[in-house]
């Protein structure tokens, strides 16, 4: 096999064929050897020179593909280094092979795959050579296409690929200037290409040529001037000639969809309407509106199903861009006809098609709602010259009946859409009970992200539909519920989708209407729960009751009796053993507790005491059938209620009563342990202790700063237990070795330690009196925890220690500065030793370690200046190691630490900052340039760019006043600016010998000049990186910042818009009102 690696003699192509065949068809060691040899062959810098021989002589297709991939690599990375004659020779050879394999129809079909790869290689050459070194390419390919039908077919594919490379994929593969030049060239020479396409589509009879030309036209349509579309006959031509032909209709309607997506000046409106009428006439003849689309889709071929999906895409694209001209009276018939088609398509049981339709429905109802909002109240009722409150309009649709609103055009369409949305409603994430593939009702354990996203979109549409006609929405929902209750439409699916839809419109009705509607719904559901027999039926109804009530906190807050009834019903469900019911009852309870907390601690009219008193009194009975995790949720829910009690002495009493049971268990075990330490050897005791601590964590999480009396009560015993447990673990490890840390007993003991740490963390992160924390909690905590962490074997160290210290540093900030050396002595060196051996061991410690470093740098920076120089050097080394890490999160943390450290140092006095930069500037610069040009670290581009710009600025602005070089090694006129230029030049020339020195020199001058303009600096940096052969592959991550900014801006705009629409943000997701925080 190694014979193919002998580049000093002619390649044995037959041997290469056998090696490739072994790789693809062999097994075991022989296959691995073939893989190794082929990898070496492809990596060899002279491998491309064998491509001609391989393409001419090889008998095995995969071998030819390898030859083309080697050529592709040459073209994309070293093309400019080749002499002009060699470049011309390769280009002419590729063209010749392409013509040879595409001029004959039989050969074209046989060599289709090879030819496709050959076309891609030609396009890579075009990106390098055209137009400057190949100015006649477009005229040549157009002329050649007229000589031979099969050659013409392949040329269409080449033109399509070239268009895709320039207009679709260029952003992340070529520099900005190169992309702009190629786009201008393509547009400038398009007339010839368009004329060729038109001639083919008018005259050709060969199906594969027609399909290839339509496919190529499809790629042109999103960038060519509109004159080519509407000032020629191309639309009529493709619609009349190809839309009704099964073989061509999919690619034809894709072309029409691309045209429909274009936005234009009003002068083309009539052209768009004419096109739409043409298409809908064909659609009505091919697929009559009366067809049962759901059934027809199920029975259709793949080609026919694709057409229905493409029709949905066409309708949605056209409506999204050109709806208003269709709303003119003369076009309303075709408008409503087309919307009826879209409604029928929306009923098809295919999620991807429904999502296409949903995107348009969402736009339509949002537009109609916004128009409605802009009508002044004075136009609806001159007596009320006020701005229009949404709830008044929503609850009085008749007020709008006489106004010229667009929503009136769509009245029947919107009424049907309400039913379609209800029938298709997907499961909200709060619902834990689902029907599995076997038709059984079970608890769902894995949430589907796609379903959650789809639910949010459907919910938005239903909220808008409610505002557009609240009366019709109520009628549609109550009539459907009535049919379910009487049994004519009873099914789990029908009840689920209806209740999910009812829950989704919470907040969209005014309070009076919501009350009437919801009272009827909940009464019907409670009656259904009593009426239905069978555990599965009851579980389905129960889950829907819980979901609906959980979505309407405003209603519950306004109707105390109903709230109390609902909560007592939840307590009943907590004794129901059907899978998922108890979980959902607890989740709904905590949701209601968060949103209605004040109502539980206030004494309501007609009650003898606040409801929280009764809940705590019956706590043991209510939670007796719950799992420990569910019980913790219950305690957390009670904590939210207690946090709303404004009177401190009453709040403390409630906390005392709430924690009575866990405190009793705690005190019993602590008393026993004081008498006999062996108690902690009992697994059941360990389990009880862990559970008690987790209960405390749950309550502390929701009660917050007010939990101090409970913390203080058990704090000394807790730290004593921490030490005792740690001693037991050490004894077991000493006796049994490291393996002991994996045993159930030691794992149980470690859980106790972790929960103690989590409890302290939970309290300190919410504490308000930080001096009290610093003076009373921290000294004893550090005494118990730090030395223990240092002395433990690595496998017995808990990452929670690092998390807790990070919380303390973030909370106490400069109050903790004097204790940072103590902290670093205990946790820094030993943790660094654990995580620096590789990139994978101790992942939790790894993440926590760097988060701690960042917290210290941000909050207690002066402490870092006072640690010994060797330890400080270790800190710097660990930061560098973190941003060279393979984990994205750790890379990002490391880069943030470095940027913040550089800024901190630059803000210090010259003595401190100069000393730091003189020691570390050059090594840090080298490390940043390393990760910047390394393909495994592309995700850090944004922060790498900011750090580099900051480092350059410090030199260019003379903020560093000491030499960054050894003055004895350089002439007297040397300065930092000149040294930096030379240093970066030498570094890059050495690292990337394939780049011309002039390229590197221009890059260095540009980025140094742009160090204060972060956007231009980043663009220049990105263009340079794309040129690097080592930086090949997918460069999408270099654009991550723009994508993140765009997404953040979209999310912000969506949130601001949603806040203006009642019900658009779920009441349970709304920020808690001030009154609830009392």
UniProtKB/Swiss-Prot annotation:
Record keywords: Nucleus, Protein transport, Transport
Record bears the keyword S-adenosyl-L-methionine: no
One of the GO biological process terms: ribosomal large subunit export from nucleus
GO function term, MF aspect, one: nuclear export signal receptor activity
Localization per record: Nucleus
Pfam families linked to this entry: CRM1_C (PF08767), CRM1_repeat (PF18777), CRM1_repeat_2 (PF18784), CRM1_repeat_3 (PF18787), IBN_N (PF03810), Xpo1 (PF08389)
Function recorded in the entry: Receptor for the leucine-rich nuclear export signal (NES).
Protein's name in the database: Exportin-1
